[in-house]
Structure formats: structure tokens, C-alpha cells
Amino acid sequence: IDVLISEDVIDTRIRELAAQIDADYAGKSVTLLCTLKGAVFFACELAKRITIPVFMEFIQTSSYVGTKSTGKVSMKLDVDDSAVKDKNIIIIEDVIDTGKTLSVVKEMMQARNPASLKVCSLLDKHECRTVPFEGDYIGFTIGDDFIVGYGLDVDQKYRNLPYIGIVR
């Protein structure tokens, strides 16, 4: 595994994203809707650095088996409508890849009438899009390498690496 983005660089970028969220939602609160399991590390670090009131909710979707996307999105864990309705929701994702999963999740959440709805992803593999989708807060734009660490895994391994690495 080769280091792609170091722990220090990730930390600096998360602080920048938190500052942007603070500015965008000054005087308000936000609900971070964390996608399990991959985005947990990112969501926790981001939440610690946001200074406005933060609430956290969790959802779990699945579209991968091993290193391959199945192309189908399934919701394994969802939240109550009351956790979304009239709230400032920021969906927290580890990586935007094809855009399919987040398109489905965003559509589902929008139907629950949030006050606002945005997406924050640590990583963006923009060249991999198969549907039009743009995140609102992006940590890093990267290529199509298969990556692990900082919450990202391959068959549940390497999630705990403190950096983002490329599997060779």
C-alpha cells in the first residue's frame, strides 16, 4: 500500500472544510448524516472541528462487493423522517465514485423535506461518474486507483490506516 494522502494533509483539509461549513451555516445547526462504515473516521474528525452545533445521524448503504461496484444501491440502515425534516443536512461520504449511491441517497433525503441538503465527501473520483453528481464540500479530487485507509476498506481490511493509500 502506497501513501496517497498523508494524515497531516488530511487533517489540514478537514479543518478547512469545517471552517467553510461554519461560515456557510453561521448561527444555525447542522446534522451530519454519516454514511457507514467508510465515512465514520472523516465524519468524527469533521464534527470535532465544526464550531456551530452539530447533530449526528447514521445511514448505511451498500453497492460494493470487494473492490467492484454492483451498480445497485441498497439501504441497510436508515433514519427516521424526523431526523431530516426541517434540518440542515450534510450527507458525509468517504468517496464519491460513480455518483449513483449518493444520487439515490440525496433523492431519498430530499423527499423528507430538509431545510437544506448538501454533500461533503473526503474524496472525489470525478472521472468515474456514470451519473451527473457534484458534491458541495470536497476534500480531495483523486484518480481511479483503489484506495484504502481513513475509513476506506477492502473486504473490511485497512480501514484503520491513518492515511489514504493506494492498493497496488
Regions inferred by a protein language model and the residue ranges of each:
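PRPP-associated nucleotide enzymes
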Residues: I1-R168
